[in-house]
A protein has these predicted regions:
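Conserved NTP-binding/hydrolysis module of P-loop NTPases
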Residues: 44-50, 54, 58-76, 89
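Interdomain motor-coupling "hinge/lid" segment immediately C-terminal to the ATP-binding subdomain
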Residues: 142-238, 242
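Domain-level recognition of nuclease-like catalytic cores that cleave nucleotide substrates
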Residues: 424-454
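Conserved P-loop NTPase "ATPase switch" module shared by AAA+ and STAND
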Residues: 91-113, 117
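Sensor-1/coupling segment of RecA-like P-loop NTPase cores
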Residues: 25-27, 109, 119-149
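Accessory nucleic acid-recognition modules appended to NTPase machines
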Residues: 201, 207-375
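Conserved catalytic cores of phosphodiester-cleaving nucleases, focusing on short active-site segments
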Residues: 352, 378-402, 409, 423
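Walker A/P-loop nucleotide-binding motif
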Residues: 20-38
Length: 454
């Protein structure tokens, strides 16, 4: 099922229509849907697709020649890149597209591929092509690639990052889930469609976890650790840090006390994890109350990596010997609502962004964020050009949002030194009567239930 990528598809088509040879780097995390997007883009076009693997440059050329041979194109056994490019451009018809998937494997050892590509695109007699260089190595593309290529990077036409899909796309993909199970499943799989294939909305969320995560023969069983190991060495160190973060050790000092690693070492490894978008540093919305915020907070950003290190990583032995239903009751059920709560905040923020795009909010908001205080949090702050603010909280864990929670929110406003012109309180549970009465008296206060979010 191809969903939620209409904007990306249009972007590629617009690039294709440009005159001259274009070289576009398309990148994003593994499973984000890059290959599926490209398959839809080239389905009515003249395209050669090749997936590079980790090997020598000479072997890479041999594999490319073999691929062309399978298409009925005669090639020498050990061709040069120049010969490969020449054969590709000789095809008749519309503008040729060359897609090199996981192209970082072509150039991490040397620049021979890019040097040959540079020579090709500067030939006077060349035909126009659209060359797409695709990669799952986010950290390498954003932090190392240009330095590795040097002056050769100037031939690149642009970079296009494929981001996670939204909750609404996830919900459309799994229409049979209840809204509670839908948000819970999204907190595990996130907006990574490559992971969606492993869940089935004909079953409950619990049944999906027990059947497709807690079984040692299933792909998701050790996917979290495999995902980390693909990009990083010294996995013992990274596993320890991720396990500590998943356990709730979010500050540098907490990680230092828990792991025994030096602060300098922890900082370096956290930086590497952030470059790969596995971990993120939490920043509060900038207000006059910055002295009342918590600083230096780190958390796991990748949803499935978070779930894996929270529930599977510390309980490997128990998973192997306990029945799955017993394991779920003992180790997942007691804290799962708290785990989902962070995702629910993002779903609420996405709802507000959608309402804003449809002009259903009182103002057009241009800045947004959250405020993490020492005595309480403001889950979202939206600010317009006139610096008017819409803010609120998102309750997932409590069965009922109480008037006292509203009062705490108002105290957090004072600590943040802001005054929200509009307040929205989201709750997966009910609202108490006092809150409902307050809403009747205050036209700038709104209460939003799960059902109202659609």
């Amino acid at each position: 099922m191809f969903t939620g990528r209409e904007k990306e598809l249009q972007y590629l088509n617009d690039y294709y229509e440009k005159s001259g040879t274009q070289i576009l780097v398309v990148y994003g995390q593994k499973g984000i849907g890059k290959t599926t997007l490209l398959e839809h883009f080239v389905e009515d076009k003249d395209c050669l697709y090749y997936e590079a693997i980790s090997c020598s440059t000479r072997q890479q050329r041999v594999f490319m020649a073999s691929h062309l041979g399978d298409m009925g194109i005669s090639m020498p056994e050990y061709p040069e890149f120049e010969e490969l490019f020449s054969v590709i451009e000789e095809s008749k018809g519309s503008k040729k597209i060359l897609v090199i998937d996981e192209f970082q494997n072509m150039c991490k050892t040397d620049n021979e591929f890019f040097e040959a590509l540079y020579d090709y695109i500067n030939r006077e007699d060349k035909k126009d092509m659209f060359i797409i260089l695709c990669s799952s190595s986010i950290g390498w593309v954003e932090n190392s690639m240009v330095g590795k290529l040097g002056a050769l990077s100037r031939m690149l036409s642009g970079f296009y990052k494929i981001k996670e899909l939204k909750y609404q796309d996830f919900k459309a993909h799994f229409p049979l889930f209840s809204i509670e199970d839908s948000i819970g499943a999204f907190s595990i799989l996130g907006g990574v469609p490559g992971l969606w294939q492993y869940f089935n909305d004909e079953f409950s969320l619990r049944e999906n976890i027990e059947s497709f995560i807690l079984q040692s023969n299933e792909k998701l069983f050790d996917y979290g650790q495999q995902y980390v190991a693909e990009e990083l060495r010294e996995t013992a160190v990274y596993n320890t840090l991720l396990g500590a973060l998943a356990e709730g050790k979010h500050k540098l000092n907490d990680l230092y006390r828990h792991t025994g690693f030096s602060r300098a070492k922890i900082s370096v490894y956290l930086k590497n994890l952030m470059q790969l978008e596995i971990v993120e540093k939490v920043f509060s919305f900038d207000t006059e109350g910055r002295d009342n915020t918590q600083k230096g907070i780190y958390q796991i950003k990748h949803p499935y990596v978070h779930f894996y290190y929270r529930y599977l990583f510390p309980n490997q032995t128990k998973i192997m010997f306990w029945e799955t239903d017993e394991f779920y009751d003992q180790f997942i059920a007691p804290t799962f609502k708290h785990f989902v709560a962070g995702c629910y905040k993002k779903v609420c923020q996405e709802f507000l962004e959608r309402e804003s795009a449809l002009e259903r909010l009182p103002e057009k908001f241009i800045n947004r964020g959250e405020w993490v205080g020492k005595k309480g949090n403001i889950d979202f702050i939206f600010q317009d050009e006139e610096e008017e603010i819409l803010a609120g909280i998102c309750n997932w864990e409590k069965e009922m949002l109480m008037y006292e929670d509203y009062q705490l929110f108002m105290e957090c406003q004072e600590s943040a030194k802001i005054k929200a012109e509009y307040i929205i309180l989201f709750s997966a549970g009910n609202f108490d009567n006092r809150l409902r009465e307050e809403m009747k008296k205050n036209p700038k206060l709104a209460l939003v239930s799960l059902e109202q979010m659609g």
